[in-house]
Amino acid sequence: MYRENHHIHFVGIGGIGMSGIAELLLHLGYSVSGSDLRSSATTKRLQDLGATIYEGHQAASCAGASVVVTSSAVAEDNPEVVQAREDKIPVIPRAEMLAELMRLKTFGIAVAGSHGKTSTTSLIGCLLSQTGFDPTIVVGGKVDSFGGNAKLGEGDFLVAEADESDGSFLKLSPVLEVVTNIDLEHLDYYTDIEHIKETFLSFIDKIPFYGAAIVCLDDENVAAILPQVQKRLITYGLTPQADVSADNLRFAAGRSTFRVRAAGEVLGEISVFPSGTHNVYNALAAVAIGLELEIPFGKIATALASFGGVQRRMQHKGEGKGITVIDDYAHHPTEIRASLKAIKETWPEKRLVVLFQPHRYSRTQALFEEFKTCFHQADCLIMTDIYEASESPIEGVSTEILLEAIKAHGQRYTRHIPEIASLATEVMPNLREGDLVVTLGAGNIVQAGEEICQLLGQE
């Protein structure tokens, strides 16, 4: 964008992906406004940086905008979108604005995949920040090391999380791509797993001749598309067949430690936060990026060792009375299995009490079979009503039905507490010393964990 007097309006500006782009544009000197259904700490932060924020969606909010940016959650009948189209104001998806930011930098690194995108993007951002690249970073989570979900750097690289949920990540033109995995997800947009794989193939095909795709060889759906890829590939995984591989995995004190091999030789060890095999994969992708950029392995190891984590990813919320509270964003069965496995590996002696909030009726319906068995690591499973995320209820899809199926598949202790507001107070009497409470989900389940921490401090 060649004029800095552009007025950029975001519909749904409080979203984790939208707010990061808005923050970068503010730092670049653009006029930014935005609306969201309700105020939040995120919208307050943007307001403090100079954005004009509207609570709720009204047609007048986009008046005077040069362009209107929408997230995939914004419907076409949103009054601001309708008004913008009537006024001939361009309406673009979030990914198109991210692509414009990427164009302003010399080299883009995009991280895509069904799971692990946020952590992997954050690790790569940390690596480049700690090794002198001073990258610009846009990520779908709040990263402790730079205190938010976006950072404007002076260097030539932009590191971004690429959202595949509506296919709009195809608007990006990165030089390096990471594909962490491909799983059945976002079936409100995709028809089936083959449709998802075809879209990822198109994404990889956007790499220029001098770029590369860094892909996880251990993921069966990623491996399935590799014969069709015509771009340069760098594979990573636990298999020794990968270009960059890990072995000798250990988990202790909340950290993952492993040995790295590349080009047939042992490079050394990496120790990174947090614990878990899935986090080893995330870190391996960052190692592969570092090696591709010719960063010495010792510097890669030092940089990744300094990584402090991402909020809502295996995040320690607090403890009291011998009870520990952890929060995690996992909401897909694959993510839930990985997170609970990692937690059990780290705290094998603790009773694991899981508070889960299902996210979206469509996801609960599409992945119903997978949800039946993904909680087996939990000693106690307590589930709230489904977080609708702007969806309408679907007949035959409910927490009660899901819990009955989970119980029928061997889960011993299950309980339904419909409302988040009463979850903490109803759970507290059943907790005992030595318990580990984990809040899981992509909605507002984190509030329950924070309330439990407060109650533990008051007793």
From Swiss-Prot:
Its subcellular locations are: Cytoplasm
Q: What SUPFAM superfamilies does this protein's entry cite?
A: MurCD N-terminal domain, MurD-like peptide ligases, catalytic domain, MurD-like peptide ligases, peptide-binding domain
Query: Coding gene?
Result: murC
Tell whether Chloroplast is among the UniProt keywords. no
Instruction: Please list the residues that bind ATP.
Output: G113, S114, H115, G116, K117, T118, S119
Its job: Cell wall formation.
Note the Pfam families from the entry.
Mur_ligase, Mur_ligase_C, Mur_ligase_M
This enzyme's EC code(s): 6.3.2.8
| Name of the protein described by the UniProt record | UDP-N-acetylmuramate--L-alanine ligase
Keyword DNA repair listed? The answer is no
The organism of origin for this protein: Desulfotalea psychrophila (strain LSv54 / DSM 12343)
Q: In which pathway does it act?
A: Cell wall biogenesis; peptidoglycan biosynthesis
